[in-house]
């Protein structure tokens, strides 16, 4: 067998990796989890369970919904429809085809259903099976997720954002004293289910407990307790303890002494031991809990109390007459003086009363006696009347309603999470499978609420991340599915009851349209299904990691208060405290922290390293906010010695509630994995984040997402080390699927022969077609460029091609430019930016934007529209860019007003004049009965046509252009097929050759003789086909050849089949919208150079607008003649407090000067002045141990590495663990620069030095998506508003500039009467005046008259609508 690693050692791709000098001190023990796995796990693993056999699927997601909805039975229980299994077919179109054809990327869901028909004996009621039919039923197309975690819906890429909502369970809170004027705290409890009715319990100002269902009218809580079946006695015994008062003759009552019930107070009577008669404390003396415990310990069991002490106490059981057992007073009644006399008269020796004291109030007892419902039936009817007002209440209806509210699994669902939360809060041990309320739940909720009122326990914090959970894509779609299937269930039952069940098949019962429409509606219109932010790869990743508190079932902007939006201590390591929008959504839309992940219950977890006996281990544990509260957690930058032990006497740790305490090392349970785990991906890309003010860091993270991909991008010289991870996970770059060797590379595709051998030992081939100049969702340009060369050995997951905004596998949102901080002639006033002409000339910040234009030829009432070059009344000049079909050529340069696609529409017949008749007779019909409805380039757009797509309806004949495009595409498919086949053939025939050489021929083609021994030369004279005709003596070899042939034929057949399928799909015509015959899409690419008015920003929230482009010779320059690229205002720093940008500039200055130093060393090495050792020594001094892998390689590779860093040395300064000021100074010294980072600058205009030293350095700047070209426009003529007759406003309406109230004041202030009159009349809404003015301009006259503005007429009409008849009377002068 041929060794596959024949030229592997050629050159591993990893040699091209960029090495950064890392300033971080903390070793990473955990990798950043895949940044988009939150989306993929939720949908593919948990909801669809895609590549799992149906027998191994867990009861979650789609499986659990189908299990819960089925079986469906009809009303008479004769037919029963059961669910067996489900599976997905392969999608009809792949992702690329869907986005091109404006379709949704979805797979057909096939569900196997079993319909059982029963025979019921009318006499005995016994049932037996009559028949079973099983069938696979199509249930609609379910959207699939692309490999990047997005959905393609109607051709556009969308993201479903995860939602933060209140976790199901029970929550206790108080009103913070806001409701009652006295400031009394009113406690309440709320049970929030995942779906179903809400249950609220609340105290009122009089300490009576009420409950509400779904915020309806309130009822006494004891009504609820009675409704669940509790009697008065059970209620009182459950919520209160009882104590017995025993009669002591002539002395009073003896009662048990309980020290726990004693609070500090002065005694009103003596404290007497009932057993001994000793007086322990006199009246007026003070007793404390401590003293009470002392007495109890000394043997005080019972105390004597006065006779009248019983007055005001409550009975804990019925008071009965000892003689005849007659009930004298009911349980719970208060003992009055009269009742006490009766007790004395009847000589009742023992009286049981409730223990009611400051630690346990009489709230339940008071509520019980306020409530008029005395039994379960009355309670249920009372609840029924509140929920169904106006309906007659009978016990069956009331019982059924109450059961359905909280105890029916179909209508009420706490979810597993809700049950776990409920059990932990109420200290219960109910199975997690019980997801409805139980009687124990309700009893204990009331108990905990009363305990809170009594001062035991604490209320819940709703903003704690243990009480908020995340609903990701899978769960959101699961809920929609459930809605759809419940609707479908109703229609199934109706169809079962309507038809003849014996002849019906499962597919006749199921109407999949109901389900499809619900899912479609969610993806198209839900607030959480959003148009993906595709400006650059970072904005894509951030969008997928976003957490929104808005949306259905969430908060609304207007009602969200400050607490919900604020940063909470539990956000640490879970939600980024920095990245959130400015404006009304602040704090409601958040980003997940870099290392965070979501657990199976929907709670966010953060990783920590376990600490054992003060020793930090490499074990990483993920904790949720609830679990974290139990531990003491140290910070990642705690000092650790070589043995991994925590150093120092005390360690600063976080404990529950977000407080920090100092503890000894052995008490620490965990430490953070890395300081970076606190912030999100965007914030972790900001170097020196720790030196920036938080508000500016917020702007920095948000503005990085608006950076436009440039034609040429640079990775930042000063990075944070996360750049590579972001580029890899974003999906913008192309990753190798398997280990392999690069066989072919061009700008459009990469062909790799993989090294993972198949069963037969043959290689497979991976072909990567790169995206070229594709339009993103935000009209930026998606373009991929290969990074590999032929012969490179690539490993699985290596980056083999850069995408937009990536550079050598690292994210690169902007460019490194040389900046100087100094004022320059006022041109950098208020954050304006001054740029050098070089930046425009060399396309440093030039970006490509692609616009899509579409034209549809429809079938109209008067006949079909036609795409043609034959357009009436259009000159040949205007048609110069169109082909014979009427569609523009690719590569044509177009500007506003040019025709892109010629189209004519039939127009209705109108009566024609004799002259027209004559013209028609002479010149034919055509020109008259159609009107021009061509697609023109809109105003403000110009550029080059880069792509044209033509879609024709099935059955409509394709035009030449469509056929040409199709042919091009088929050639591309054929090339992919041929290249793959060629690689396989090369392998197969080399293998055959190895097998055949040295064998003796028995039979073969004409060119070979029987009995000859085969040589390599002999085989060279044969064609490939003749190899298979050779038969040799060795039977084993012949078997092996037979196997190879079978595999080869199978592979070839599979390739041909795949090619045929693709071609068939391409030629089959398209599914176009109703009435459309043909759709043409034209893509125009526009180059946007940097110009005044464009917005630029750094990574630290430092943003500004370009004010002027200055010739290079006028810009300040360095002593060596280098011209500064950008001049920024130093006054933008002190008040903004984003000092990180200055440290970045200094380190950037070190970067380019170190690069110069390395270049100088290389030059000297080439001139033989120094040896390689000096270069190695300098590299070690600069990079430290990072560089060892390079230094072990041959000399030429070390020199090649040095050349790669000739523009600048790349640094990584991780967030909160990066370079300190001293490190920056050390680097500047190493580069031979002044440690202040400041230099002498020369003014380009005068040639003189500036008065003082200036901070100069390399800084990373971004061009933002707010381009002046898309904002500024001008109008000469255009549309007018119908009512006011004033020009419309805004760029989209091609409107004018508003001359508003304040502008009028300005002209009035100057007394410019005529200018003002002109503004308010002919230039605005004087209809006649403006027509006359136009005429006079045409005639070349310079005079005009102002008439009455239309707004005056509008005002008069408004007066008339108020019944005031105002007339304008014009008197002649």
UniProtKB/Swiss-Prot annotation:
GO annotation terms (biological process): DNA-templated transcription
UniProt GO cellular component terms: DNA-directed RNA polymerase complex
Enzyme Commission no: 2.7.7.6
Keywords: DNA-directed RNA polymerase, Nucleotidyltransferase, Transcription, Transferase
GO MF annotation list: DNA binding; DNA-directed RNA polymerase activity; ribonucleoside binding
InterPro entries: DNA-dir_RNA_pol_bsu_ext_1_sf, DNA-dir_RNA_pol_bsu_external_1, DNA-dir_RNA_pol_su2, DNA-dir_RNAP_su2_dom, DNA-dir_RNAP_su2_hyb_sf, RNA_pol_bsu_bac, RNA_pol_bsu_CS, RNA_pol_bsu_protrusion
Catalytic activity: RNA(n) + a ribonucleoside 5'-triphosphate = RNA(n+1) + diphosphate
Domain of life assignment: Bacteria
Pfam families associated with the record: RNA_pol_Rpb2_1, RNA_pol_Rpb2_2, RNA_pol_Rpb2_3, RNA_pol_Rpb2_45, RNA_pol_Rpb2_6, RNA_pol_Rpb2_7
Top EC category: transferase
Quaternary context: The RNAP catalytic core consists of 2 alpha, 1 beta, 1 beta' and 1 omega subunit. When a sigma factor is associated with the core the holoenzyme is formed, which can initiate transcription.
UniProt record similarity statement: Belongs to the RNA polymerase beta chain family.
Role: DNA-dependent RNA polymerase catalyzes the transcription of DNA into RNA using the four ribonucleoside triphosphates as substrates.
Record-given protein name: DNA-directed RNA polymerase subunit beta
Organism: Rickettsia africae (strain ESF-5)
């Amino acid at each position: 067998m041929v060794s596959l690693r024949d030229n592997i050692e050629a050159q591993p791709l990893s040699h091209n990796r960029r090495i950064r000098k890392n300033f971080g001190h903390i070793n990473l023990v955990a990798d950043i989890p895949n940044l988009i796995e939150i989306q993929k796990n939720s949908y593919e693993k948990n909801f669809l369970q895609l590549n799992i056999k149906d027998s191994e699927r867990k009861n979650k997601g789609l499986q659990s919904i189908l299990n819960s909805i089925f079986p469906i039975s009809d009303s008479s229980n004769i037919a029963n429809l059961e669910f067996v299994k489900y599976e997905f077919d392969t999608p009809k179109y792949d992702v690329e085809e869907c986005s091109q054809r404006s379709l949704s990327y979805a797979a057909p869901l096939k569900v196997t259903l079993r319909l059982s028909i029963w025979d019921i004996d009318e006499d005995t009621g016994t049932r037996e099976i009559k028949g079973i039919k099983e069938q696979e039923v199509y249930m609609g197309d379910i959207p699939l997720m692309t490999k990047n975690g997005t959905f393609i819906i109607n051709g556009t890429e969308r993201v479903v954002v995860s939602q933060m909502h209140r976790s199901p369970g029970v929550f206790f809170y108080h009103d913070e004293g806001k409701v009652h004027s006295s400031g009394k705290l009113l406690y309440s409890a709320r049970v929030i289910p995942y779906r179903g009715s809400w249950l609220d319990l609340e105290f009122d100002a009089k300490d009576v407990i009420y409950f509400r269902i779904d915020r309806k009218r309130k009822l006494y809580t004891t009504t609820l307790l009675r409704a669940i079946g509790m009697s008065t006695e059970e209620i009182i015994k459950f919520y209160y303890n009882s104590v017995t008062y025993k009669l002591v003759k002539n002395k009073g009552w003896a009662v048990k002494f309980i020290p726990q019930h004693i609070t500090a107070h002065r005694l009103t009577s003596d404290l007497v031991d009932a057993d001994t008669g000793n007086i322990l404390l006199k009246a007026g003396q003070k007793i404390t809990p401590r003293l009470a415990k002392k007495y109890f310990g000394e043997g005080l069991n019972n105390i004597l109390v006065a006779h009248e002490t019983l007055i005001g106490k409550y009975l804990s059981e019925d008071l009965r007459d000892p003689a005849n057992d007659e009930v004298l007073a009911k349980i719970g009644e208060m003992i009055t003086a009269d009742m006490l006399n009766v007790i004395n008269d009847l000589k009742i020796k023992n009286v049981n009363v409730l223990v009611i004291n400051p630690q346990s109030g009489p709230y339940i007892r008071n509520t019980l006696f306020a409530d008029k419902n005395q039994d379960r039936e009355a309670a249920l009817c009372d609840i029924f009347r509140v929920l169904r007002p106006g309906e007659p209440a009978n016990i069956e209806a009331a019982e059924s309603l109450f059961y359905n509210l909280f105890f029916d699994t179909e209508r009420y669902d706490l979810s597993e999470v809700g049950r776990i939360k409920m059990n932990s809060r109420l200290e219960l041990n109910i199975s997690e499978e019980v997801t409805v309320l139980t009687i124990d739940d309700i009893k204990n909720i009331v108990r905990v609420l009363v305990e809170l009122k009594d001062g035991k326990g604490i209320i819940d914090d709703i903003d704690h991340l243990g009480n908020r959970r995340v609903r990701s894509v899978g769960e959101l779609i699961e809920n929609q599915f459930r809605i759809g299937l419940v609707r479908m269930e109703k229609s199934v039952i109706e169809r079962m009851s309507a038809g003849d069940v014996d002849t019906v098949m499962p597919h006749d019962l199921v109407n999949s349209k109901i389900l499809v429409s619900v899912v479609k509606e969610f993806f198209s219109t839900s607030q959480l299904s959003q148009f993906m932010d595709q400006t650059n790869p970072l904005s894509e990743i951030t969008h997928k990691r976003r957490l929104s508190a808005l949306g259905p079932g969430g908060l609304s902007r207007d009602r969200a208060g400050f607490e919900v939006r604020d940063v909470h201590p539990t956000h640490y390591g879970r939600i980024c405290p920095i990245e959130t929008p400015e404006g009304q959504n602040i704090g409601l839309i958040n980003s997940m922290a870099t290392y965070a992940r979501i657990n199976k219950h929907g709670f966010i977890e953060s990783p920590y390293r376990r600490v054992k006996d003060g020793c930090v281990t490499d074990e990483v544990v993920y904790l949720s906010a609830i679990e974290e509260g139990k531990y003491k957690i140290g910070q990642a930058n705690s000092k650790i010695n070589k043995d991994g032990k925590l150093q120092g006497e005390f360690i600063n740790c976080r404990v529950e509630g977000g407080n920090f305490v100092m503890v000894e090392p052995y008490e620490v349970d965990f430490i953070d994995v890395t300081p970076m785990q606190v912030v999100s991906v965007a914030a972790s890309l900001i170097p020196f984040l720790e030196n920036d003010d938080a508000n500016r860091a917020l702007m920095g993270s948000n503005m990085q997402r608006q950076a436009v991909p440039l034609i040429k991008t640079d990775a930042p010289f000063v990075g944070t080390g996360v750049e590579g991870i972001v580029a890899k996970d974003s999906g913008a770059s192309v990753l190798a699927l398997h280990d392999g060797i690069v066989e072919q590379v061009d700008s459009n595709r990469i062909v790799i022969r993989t090294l993972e051998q198949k069963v037969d030992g043959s290689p497979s081939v991976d072909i990567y077609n790169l995206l070229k100049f594709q339009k993103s969702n935000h009209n930026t340009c998606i373009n991929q460029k290969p990074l590999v060369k032929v012969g490179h050995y690539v490993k699985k997951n290596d980056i083999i091609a850069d995408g937009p905004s990536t550079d050598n596998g690292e994210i690169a949102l902007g460019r490194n430019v040389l900046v100087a901080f100094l004022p320059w002639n006022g041109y950098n006033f208020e954050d304006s930016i001054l740029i050098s002409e070089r930046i425009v000339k060399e396309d440093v910040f030039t970006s490509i934007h692609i616009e899509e234009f579409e034209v549809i030829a429809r079938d109209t009432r008067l006949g079909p529209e036609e795409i043609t070059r034959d357009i009436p009344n259009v000159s040949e000049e205007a048609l110069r860019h169109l082909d014979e079909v009427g569609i523009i050529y690719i590569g044509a340069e177009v500007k506003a007003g040019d025709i892109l696609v010629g189209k004519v529409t039939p127009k209705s017949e109108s009566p024609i004049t004799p002259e027209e008749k004559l013209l028609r007779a002479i010149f034919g019909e055509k020109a008259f009965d159609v009107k021009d409805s061509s697609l023109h380039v809109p105003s403000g757009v110009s550029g080059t046509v880069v792509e044209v797509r033509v879609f024709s309806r099935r059955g409509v004949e394709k035009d030449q252009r469509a056929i040409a495009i199709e042919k091009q595409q088929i050639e591309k498919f054929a090339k992919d097929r041929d290249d793959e086949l060629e690689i396989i053939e090369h392998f197969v025939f080399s293998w055959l050759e190895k097998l055949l050489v040295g064998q003796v021929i028995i039979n073969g083609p004409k060119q070979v003789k029987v009995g000859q021994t085969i040589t390599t030369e002999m085989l060279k004279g044969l064609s490939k086909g003749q190899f298979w005709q050779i038969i040799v003596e060795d039977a084993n070899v012949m078997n092996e050849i037979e196997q190879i042939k079978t595999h080869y034929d199978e592979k070839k057949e599979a390739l041909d089949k795949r090619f045929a399928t693709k071609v068939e799909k391409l030629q089959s015509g398209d599914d176009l919208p109703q009435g459309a015959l043909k759709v043409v899409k034209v893509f125009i690419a526009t180059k946007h150079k940097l110009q005044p008015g464009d917005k630029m920003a750094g990574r630290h929230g430092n943003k500004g607008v370009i004010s002027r482009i200055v010739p290079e010779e006028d810009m300040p320059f360095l002593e060596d003649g280098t011209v500064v690229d950008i001049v920024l205002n130093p006054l933008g720093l002190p008040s903004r407090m984003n000092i990180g940008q200055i440290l970045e500039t200094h380190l950037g200055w070190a970067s380019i000067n170190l690069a110069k130093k390395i270049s100088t060393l290389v030059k000297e090495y080439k001139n033989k002045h120094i040896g390689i050792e000096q270069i190695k020594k300098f590299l070690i001094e600069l990079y430290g141990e990072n560089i060892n892998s390079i230094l072990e390689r041959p000399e030429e590779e070390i020199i090649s590495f040095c050349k790669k860093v000739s523009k600048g040395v790349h640094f990584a300064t991780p967030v909160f663990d990066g370079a300190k000021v001293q490190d920056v100074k050390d680097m500047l010294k190493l580069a031979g620069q002044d440690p202040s980072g400041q230099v002498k600058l020369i003014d380009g205009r005068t040639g003189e030095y500036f008065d003082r030293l200036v901070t100069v350095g390399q800084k990373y700047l971004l061009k933002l998506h707010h381009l002046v070209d898309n904002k500024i426009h001008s109008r000469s003529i255009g549309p007018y508003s119908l009512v006011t007759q004033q020009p419309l406003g805004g760029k989209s309406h091609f409107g004018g500039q508003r001359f508003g109230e304040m502008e009028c004041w300005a002209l009035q202030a100057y007394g410019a009467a005529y200018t003002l009159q002109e503004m308010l009349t002919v230039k605005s809404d004087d209809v006649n005046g403006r027509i006359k003015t136009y005429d006079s301009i045409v005639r070349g006259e310079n005079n005009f008259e102002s008439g009455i503005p239309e707004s005056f007429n509008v005002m008069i009409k408004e007066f008339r609508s108020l019944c005031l008849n105002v007339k304008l009377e014009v008197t002649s002068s």
